[in-house]
Amino acid sequence: MTVVAIVGRPNVGKSTLFNRISKDNSALVDDLPGVTRDRNYARVSWNDKPFVIIDTAGFVGQDTSAFEELTREQILLALDEADILLFVADAKTGLHPGDAELADLLRRSSKPVFYAVNKIDGSEQRRHAAEFFELGLDRIYPISAAHGFGISELMDDLCAAIPEAPAQTAEEEESGGAIRVSILGRPNVGKSTLVNHLLGAPRVIVSPVPGTTRDAVDSHIVKAGQEYVLIDTAGIRRKGRTREKLEKISIIKALQSVERSHVVVLLLDAVEGVTDQDLHIAGYIKERSRACIVGINKWDAADKDPKRTKRFMDDLHDRFRFLTYAPVLTFSALTGRNVARLLPTVKEVFRQYNQRVTTGIVNRALEETLARHEPPQAGNRRRLKFYYATQTAVRPPTFVLFCNYPQAIHFSYERYLTNRFREAFGLDKTPIRLIFRPRQRTGGTS
Ligand SMILES: Nc1nc2c(ncn2[C@@H]2O[C@H](COP(=O)(O)OP(=O)(O)OP(=O)(O)O)[C@@H](O)[C@H]2O)c(=O)[nH]1
Ligand SMILES: Nc1nc2c(ncn2[C@@H]2O[C@H](COP(=O)(O)OP(=O)(O)OP(=O)(O)O)[C@@H](O)[C@H]2O)c(=O)[nH]1
């Protein structure tokens, strides 16, 4: 998945541009309820090119007192991890020394960079925009993120730089019947230790210093006749940076790994608990409808007081309640205790993720579900009616339900249907998707 990062000085309009690009293309991101909207990355599609767009401001916080340092860090991060850079400057303030410095850094990159000058909403700003040619750039895109001016020219050109044909299908074929698994989690949570344990030999360097593993490599293993590909086994860190920065950086890599996975193992630290970043990754897993297992590592070091354990688990379920389908496992990658449960669980989750249900069974379940709890009235006082349903896809199991007023279905009724389908089809450990369609008339008679 191509990652496009928006970079620029504070207050130039990065977030506004991010919102415009992601909002105008919300088809792909909006069809899943209950996922947090408060975030700085989005999967969008422009001219049929899917990509992930990231507002880097979110990675460095709002501490403007140290903004030069922060901005530099942000640029380096984006240069490292993104595929395309989108530089934004502010025509209202005009050319700023910081812009020149950033442009300099970007010019040294081998990645495509698009330079936009924002806040072009009047003739005065247009004059200011000309100043930016002093940066020695071939092409500058005058835009107004707030009003939409110039956005399509910019995005059309940017999308042309995104490679055709996502590698997804090729990769799918290549991996045959293998289950693609990624192990994600913040630095020091024990990813390398776990991978080494699974591989049965210390192939990945483990160290108590965060960020000691480098290159992205996939590892193949066969257990009990099932092949697994551990994606990006080297993990999601960088050498020689502070822990705090590392945690901010890792999200881009994490998102890319989610894209490539069937099943994501989200590792948490039993001692440190759940962080916002864990929830961010979890939100993305949900949004991308990937199967997931929550692995609580370092269980050997956890406080075994039953009350605390209960509080930990309650808190976990509460914070991951949008991901109820993810089984939770506790283990210790260090001692190996209970790690043996992981791959069988991955296999079971994957089985459900690929499950097919015949149309007859789907419709029987639909009938029973409706009989048990009638659909509420649609807004226009007409009765909401479901006609029939059928499974249209796997990974995840996806069901299309034909009804008279798809737009009138309340979220709570959708949740009810989802839960009943899960129960009826034994799909408790996989995401499933329900799509509501207006009934299509066939044949052209009557
Ligand atoms: N006039 C005008 N104002 C804009 C435009 N785009 C953004 N702004 C304003 O510029 C200000 C900063 O916008 P943000 O999108 O928050 O900028 P940012 O670069 O994300 O800022 P940081 O998060 O501080 O780095 C806001 O008050 C926006 O309303 C535009 O096209 N025209
Ligand atoms: N007590 C305990 N320590 C563990 C366990 N798993 C890993 N550790 C320790 O945690 C530290 C970090 O482990 P790593 O496997 O390097 O963690 P990582 O997630 O790969 O870390 P980064 O390279 O920073 O991303 C090491 O000192 C491990 O020995 C566990 O199950 N129990």
From Swiss-Prot:
<feature type="binding site">
    <location>
        <begin position="8"/>
        <end position="15"/>
    </location>
    <ligand>
        <name>GTP 1</name>
    </ligand>
</feature>
<dbReference type="InterPro" id="IPR015946">
    <property type="entry name" value="KH_dom-like_a/b"/>
</dbReference>
<dbReference type="InterPro" id="IPR031166">
    <property type="entry name" value="G_ENGA"/>
</dbReference>
<comment type="function">
    <text>GTPase that plays an essential role in the late steps of ribosome biogenesis.</text>
</comment>
<dbReference type="Pfam" id="PF01926">
    <property type="entry name" value="MMR_HSR1"/>
</dbReference>
<dbReference type="GO" id="GO:0042254">
    <property type="term" value="P:ribosome biogenesis"/>
</dbReference>
<dbReference type="InterPro" id="IPR016484">
    <property type="entry name" value="GTPase_Der"/>
</dbReference>
<feature type="binding site">
    <location>
        <begin position="232"/>
        <end position="236"/>
    </location>
    <ligand>
        <name>GTP 2</name>
    </ligand>
</feature>
<feature type="binding site">
    <location>
        <begin position="118"/>
        <end position="121"/>
    </location>
    <ligand>
        <name>GTP 1</name>
    </ligand>
</feature>
<feature type="binding site">
    <location>
        <begin position="185"/>
        <end position="192"/>
    </location>
    <ligand>
        <name>GTP 2</name>
    </ligand>
</feature>
<dbReference type="InterPro" id="IPR032859">
    <property type="entry name" value="KH_dom-like"/>
</dbReference>
<feature type="binding site">
    <location>
        <begin position="297"/>
        <end position="300"/>
    </location>
    <ligand>
        <name>GTP 2</name>
    </ligand>
</feature>
<keyword id="KW-0690">Ribosome biogenesis</keyword>
<feature type="domain" description="EngA-type G 1">
    <location>
        <begin position="2"/>
        <end position="166"/>
    </location>
</feature>
<dbReference type="InterPro" id="IPR005225">
    <property type="entry name" value="Small_GTP-bd"/>
</dbReference>
<keyword id="KW-0342">GTP-binding</keyword>
<protein>
    <recommendedName>
        <fullName>GTPase Der</fullName>
    </recommendedName>
</protein>
<comment type="similarity">
    <text>Belongs to the TRAFAC class TrmE-Era-EngA-EngB-Septin-like GTPase superfamily. EngA (Der) GTPase family.</text>
</comment>
<dbReference type="InterPro" id="IPR027417">
    <property type="entry name" value="P-loop_NTPase"/>
</dbReference>
<keyword id="KW-0677">Repeat</keyword>
<feature type="domain" description="EngA-type G 2">
    <location>
        <begin position="179"/>
        <end position="354"/>
    </location>
</feature>
<feature type="binding site">
    <location>
        <begin position="55"/>
        <end position="59"/>
    </location>
    <ligand>
        <name>GTP 1</name>
    </ligand>
</feature>
<dbReference type="InterPro" id="IPR006073">
    <property type="entry name" value="GTP-bd"/>
</dbReference>
<dbReference type="Pfam" id="PF14714">
    <property type="entry name" value="KH_dom-like"/>
</dbReference>
<keyword id="KW-0547">Nucleotide-binding</keyword>
<feature type="domain" description="KH-like">
    <location>
        <begin position="355"/>
        <end position="440"/>
    </location>
</feature>
<comment type="subunit">
    <text>Associates with the 50S ribosomal subunit.</text>
</comment>
<dbReference type="GO" id="GO:0005525">
    <property type="term" value="F:GTP binding"/>
</dbReference>
<dbReference type="GO" id="GO:0043022">
    <property type="term" value="F:ribosome binding"/>
</dbReference>
